[in-house]
Amino acid sequence: YHVLGNHDMKDFGYTKEETMKWWKMKKRYYSFDHNNFHFIILDGNDPNPKPWSGYDRYISSEQIEWLKDDLSKTLKPTIVFSHQSLEAKGGISNREEIRKVLETITNKNGQPKVIACLSGHHHADYVNSINKIHYIQINSMSYKWVGENFKYKRFSNKIEKNFPSLSKT
């Protein structure tokens, strides 16, 4: 499963369509069920309709309507993936509108169907919770090396010895 990110296209001179073809993606946003969970993949690379500079980081009204429809049809706990964050500045420019959708489509008990949103755009590791939804930023494929002053021990001594750069990501 793939999530389109800004570095996958413009940074390397590829169009969204070329990137999707290379990854064999049939759709740029989609959902699927696995075991007892529902997964939604969003494309946060739509052009912003307002005057904008920089890379595209917007979710279109067409995609928002699809999201509402998709969420309303599932009864399973849902995890949302997007390259750009749905909670932080520098993420999806209309993130507050998207969060409102995620928070208002609830299960019968009134709890949000969405339990977590994962992203990686900010190249950092952290978790933030907003209105009962966990927003998880993962630095798993980052080119951001923070250096000796920010070393962090989280693996066994053997792994740290064999892969010393892990402590600086």
Task: Write out the residue ranges for each language-model feature.
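Extended active-site neighborhood of metal-dependent phosphoesterases/phosphodiesterases
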Residues: 1-68, 72-73, 97-114, 124-169
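Active-site glycine-centered loops adjacent to acidic/histidine catalytic or metal-binding residues
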Residues: 5-6, 83, 120-121
